Amino acid sequence: MKYLSEMNRMYSVSIGITTNMGVSATSWIAQNADSLDARSIWVGEDIALGQETFVLTANTLSQTKKVRVGTGIIPVTVHNIVTLARVGITLSELGDGRFAFGLGIGGIQDLERHDIKIRKPVTELRKTIQTLKRLWAGETVDSESEVFSITNFGLNLTEPLKMPIFLGVRGPQMLRLTGKIADGVILSGPFDYLKNAIKIVDDAGEEVGKEKGSIEKVIWVPTIPTFKGIKEKVARRVVALVIADTPDAVIDMLNVDIERVEKIRATVAASSPKEGAEHVDDELLDVFSISGTREHMVDRFEALEKIGATEVVIGPPFSGDWRGATTEIFEEVRMRMRES
């Protein structure tokens, strides 16, 4: 079999999993990712739900041989910075160069649900990344922020640790920060927003001397293959949650029914995404997700490539015959790569 990575292509296809998925599902993905020819498996953390994040990431690394495995993302607001530094060492060694550390502040809904408030999120993320980089460089560090404080701490490394750092961010200031200090960005949102976000990241990278296009752009939006049994109401429920978690700065960029968006947000906040889904129409479904037939979904992947995406992530949600759907989507991508 000739793998996609050996072909002339501009974007890669990966698979996303979250801690709230069952072990049988995450293990199937890990055990089949190499043969599917996925570029990466990204592990998203649902705060305080399901499997332990770093155990799941380590298990995924141990079940794969070729694919990159990354966290996408770890909220720095809920983990001790010393733990994060040590996790980086452990997973980097376990993955033998295949681990990527994806970090961020955390989703709006998750942070509010756990009563976590950060006054200056951009400053917090910047300080965290700077401190982690210094620790991995072998320095003994004094540093503090809103959520951490360390004094005279070092990791006693025999040599500097190097691994790619990805940031999961949304707002303009966060995007500029990512372009300047990270190796890649994990983005989610509507196409119009993504196009603008990619430009902000690239421009910021060039400002600090990075080569044009050198920053990886990973796009992770809900992918909902309705051609294999996943019900459309599941898709609408997912989109309702996404809309509720989307910042105003992103919504303001879109040509959508703002009154409907606010109704969805209010309903999700007052009850649940299930009730909010009743207000998600076809337009919003198409704006905030990639769904439909495998051909249509891969068409959307290719559209993302045209606006600068280097990697597109499949899933979650996983429902219906998602194993068959995932396999067919990768088959469609391979077929198009061969024909191009």
Task: Enumerate the language-model features and the residues they cover.
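Glycine-rich, proline-tolerant flexible connector loops at the mouths of alpha/beta enzymes
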Residues: 40-63, 75, 111-112, 189-192, ...
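Alpha-helix-loop-beta-strand connector modules within alpha/beta enzyme cores
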Residues: 51-74, 124-131, 135, 328-340
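Acidic (Asp/Glu)-rich catalytic clusters
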Residues: 31-35, 57-68, 88-99, 179, ...
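N-terminal beta1-alpha1-beta2 module of alpha/beta enzyme domains
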Residues: 1-72, 163
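An alpha-helical appendage that flanks or caps ligand/catalytic pockets
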Residues: 2-9, 119-154, 196-306
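Short, acidic/polar
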Residues: 21-33, 84, 168-180, 234-236, ...
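Active-site mouth loops of central-metabolism enzymes
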Residues: 11-24, 74-81, 159-170, 223-224, ...
